């Protein structure tokens, strides 16, 4: 969402969790849950959340694993200072929308079982993971699957890109960042960038394992 934008940074994915708990961030507890608790003291209980008292009188809130969990069945972890990650979602119908800026900064994955199997096969090719094998793990207990070799993650923000069919795609600038980029391209530093792009050689190399659509 424009009010909670996804940060731009690079890191390395180290593991994934099947059947994750969702530890609700303090900002969401304060801004979204406490007002609803004032209206209905049983609000969290009705949704299956666990409330854990903390020292100093505060509370921690978490949602147990399951089909209603806000993270879905899988979350993909690359520990970072922004507390964001990739994850499944129980509201898969939102992927049918043309505009999908609904999150608090994390990125939702449309086909998490396929994505998990692909990543695990990249780092552990002898294990022969399949989406079916991943789904067989779904349950009520967390399962950590660590990568022997971390996988690089680069989160970018693009409002124009070329799709797999070679067609130019344009998206709305929901974060309002295009103006700054256009200004950069028009100044002297932009000339340097144009020179780099003009002399760059295109690369047609494909990854060894095909990454599924829907991320």
List the predicted regions and their residue ranges:
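Well-ordered beta-sheet/strand-loop patches within structured domains
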Residues: 1-215
């Amino acid at each position: 969402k424009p009010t909670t934008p996804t940060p731009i940074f690079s890191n390395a994915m180290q593991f994934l969790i099947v059947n994750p708990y969702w530890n609700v961030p303090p900002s969401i507890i304060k801004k979204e849950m406490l007002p609803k608790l004032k209206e209905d003291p049983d609000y969290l209980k009705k949704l299956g959340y666990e409330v854990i008292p903390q020292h100093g009188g505060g509370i921690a809130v978490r949602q147990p694993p399951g089909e209603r969990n806000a993270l879905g069945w899988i979350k993909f972890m690359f520990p970072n200072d922004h507390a964001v990650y990739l994850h499944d979602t129980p509201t898969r119908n939102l992927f049918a929308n043309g505009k999908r800026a609904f999150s608090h900064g994390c990125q939702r994955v449309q086909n998490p079982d396929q994505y998990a199997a692909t990543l695990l096969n990249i780092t552990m090719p002898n294990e022969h993971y399949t989406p079916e094998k991943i789904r067989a793990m779904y349950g009520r207990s967390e399962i950590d699957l660590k990568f022997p070799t971390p996988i690089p993650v680069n989160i970018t923000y693009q409002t124009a890109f070329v799709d797999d069919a070679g067609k130019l795609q344009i998206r709305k600038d929901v974060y309002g960042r295009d103006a700054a980029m256009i200004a950069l391209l028009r100044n002297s530093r932009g000339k340097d960038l144009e020179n780099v792009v003009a002399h760059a050689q295109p690369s047609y190399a494909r990854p060894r394992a095909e990454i599924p659509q829907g991320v």
